[in-house]
Design a protein with these regions (language model features):
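Active-site recognition of the HExxH zinc-binding catalytic motif
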Residues: 1, 221
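M16 family metallopeptidases and their MPP-like homologs
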Residues: 5-51, 81-107, 129-135, 186-197, ...
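An aromatic/glycine/proline-enriched structural segment found at the starts
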Residues: 94, 102, 127, 131-198, ...
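Conserved, carboxylate-rich catalytic/transport cores that coordinate ions
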Residues: 121
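Zinc-dependent metallopeptidase catalytic helix centered on the HExxH motif
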Residues: 205-206
Length: 299
């Protein structure tokens, strides 16, 4: 910015004993600092400056674009699990943006230029499209004046209409198989689109969290006890579900076979346990146990 030369933001945070980073997910981008309470005003001032006065040149974009390309090569192109995950999401979601990787496809990254970046920045980086999160030994009485001082004076940006994409119903099964010479341990999973806190039949989100814990949430889950302990055909087995997604979430099952165990046999065993839950339901003891484990994990 006009107030901070390249690198001065990070240097200021480090000089004051703090740490900083940023990340992008499917639903949001976050910038954060961990720093002493008496330096809170400093980082709020720096972030407000970054939100409104960012300067980017083509000369700066080129090396950073190369960094992102290299990150993609390292984390995706050279990682069979990540390759499969990309292909899986592209097949699982017919229309929702989750079918596209967060980091982007290689040709998309290569096409980014300073005009693309500044256009996105000017449209999205504004107080009316941001959430300020502060945690630690600070009160609202201390925080609110700082928020008003640094963010309250920033003009609202363009009003962004939230046009949420609708995912159409699936009409056919989709099965993916990825074979790679670097894979030393095969794995299997099955995934279903499911409601989240924000999408679809949201009233089911809490129940699905408990169900995931019962079926495959750890050593006491049905899948682990049956496939890993009793039948000894899997090295691991479980279920997963995340209700936080803005769009449709995924409820899934996974298993890693023991050496010599056929993948088809493993799939039948997993789905036999799932079918049992669909047919007979779960017990009150399983529900209370799952809730207690989830509460303990949240502390």
């Amino acid at each position: 910015t006009d107030n901070q030369k390249p690198g001065e933001f990070s240097a200021a945070v480090a000089r004051n004993g703090g740490q900083e980073n940023a990340f992008t997910s499917y639903d949001h981008t976050a910038y954060y600092q961990t720093i002493a309470k008496d330096r809170l005003e400093m980082v709020m001032r720096l972030e407000a400056d970054r939100m409104t006065h960012l300067l980017i040149t083509a000369k700066q974009v080129a090396p950073e674009r190369d960094v992102v390309l290299e990150e993609r090569r390292m984390r995706v192109d050279n990682n069979p699990s990540s390759q499969l995950r990309e292909q899986l999401n592209a097949a699982l979601y017919l229309n929702y943006p989750y079918r596209r990787p967060v980091i982007g496809w290689e040709h998309e990254i290569k096409a980014l230029d300073v005009d693309h970046i500044l256009s996105f920045y000017k449209r999205h980086y504004a107080p009316n499209n941001a959430v300020l999160i502060v945690e630690g030994d600070v009160t609202m009485a201390e925080l609110k004046p700082l928020a008003e001082k640094y963010y309250g004076i920033i003009p609202r940006g363009p009003e962004i209409v939230r046009e949420r994409t609708i995912e159409p119903p699936a009409r056919a099964d989709r099965r993916l198989i990825l074979e790679h010479e670097r894979v030393t341990q095969p794995g299997w999973s099955r995934r279903y689109l499911a409601p989240s806190y924000h999408y679809g039949d949201t009233q089911h989100a809490y129940a699905l969290q408990v169900l995931s814990e019962i079926i495959g949430g750890g050593p006491s889950s049905r899948l682990h006890k049956k496939l890993v302990v009793d039948d000894a055909i899997a090295l691991s087995a479980g279920a997963f579900y995340d209700a936080d997604d803005i769009g449709p979430s995924v409820f899934g099952f996974y298993a890693t076979p023991k050496p010599g165990v056929d993948m088809a046999k493993l799939e039948v065993a997993v789905m036999h346990e799932v079918d049992g839950v669909l047919r007979d339901g779960v017990t009150d003891q399983e529900v209370s146990g799952a809730i207690n484990r989830m509460r303990n994990a949240a502390v």
